[in-house]
Amino acid sequence: STEFQRYMEIVIVVDHSMVKKYNGDSPKIKAWVYEMINTITEGYRDLYIDIILSGLEIWSEKDLINVEASAGNTLKSFGEWRAKDLIHRISHDNAQLLTATDFDGPTIGLAYVASMCEPKLSVGVIQDHSSVNRLVAITLAHEMAHNLGVRHDEKDCVGVVYLCIMRIPVVEDKRSYFSDCSYIQCREYISKENPPCILNKP
């Protein structure tokens, strides 16, 4: 129903390591990102959230923050940069950094939990960890869901017959769904906190 419907305007920032990885081929980078957005848009329909790509920024010359192997440090820097720079240039609700940097350990993404609309905290960082677009897209969807108050799926979540986006580790499947747990957590967060920035239809 429409009372549940929310609109999440996101900006994807592609860092300089990505530019190098794709040999400076902007059209290729854009196509890669657009394909991911199509995938997550499909997944987020289950949560009554429309995903709108408000901006795609490519750091073609150099990084505007210090992107490092520590996902935590990179996340903090990216959030601070968003609050002091990006938010003043592009109207959006949430920003995600896509990097070719290999984060420490098994980490392929990191985001703050239940932080939608917060200037420094409505962010995530994603490692471009696979040549399979869908797998990177699932990581993106996963980190964005943390921003929306969704935690990792426990074993007793309904929907384990198919792959769930919030499962750890993420495995490949034709279509990734949010589990009932994710749906309930997202609804609870939205009804309790009612983050204002995702109410307006752009």
Curated annotation (Swiss-Prot):
It holds the Pfam family Reprolysin. GO terms for biological process: proteolysis. Its EC number is 3.4.24.-. Keywords: Disulfide bond, Hemostasis impairing toxin, Hydrolase, Metal-binding, Metalloprotease, Protease, Secreted, Toxin, Zinc. Zn(2+) binds at H142, H146, H152. Expressed by the venom gland. The keyword Secreted applies. Ca(2+) binds at E9, D93, C197, N200. It comes from the Eukaryota. Binds 1 zinc ion per subunit. One of its GO terms (molecular function) is metalloendopeptidase activity. One of its GO terms (cellular component) is plasma membrane. SUPFAM superfamilies: Metalloproteases ('zincins'), catalytic domain (SSF55486). The active site is at E143. Snake venom metalloproteinase that impairs hemostasis in the envenomed animal. This is Snake venom metalloproteinase Ac1. The lineage of its organism: Eukaryota, Metazoa, Chordata, Craniata, Vertebrata.
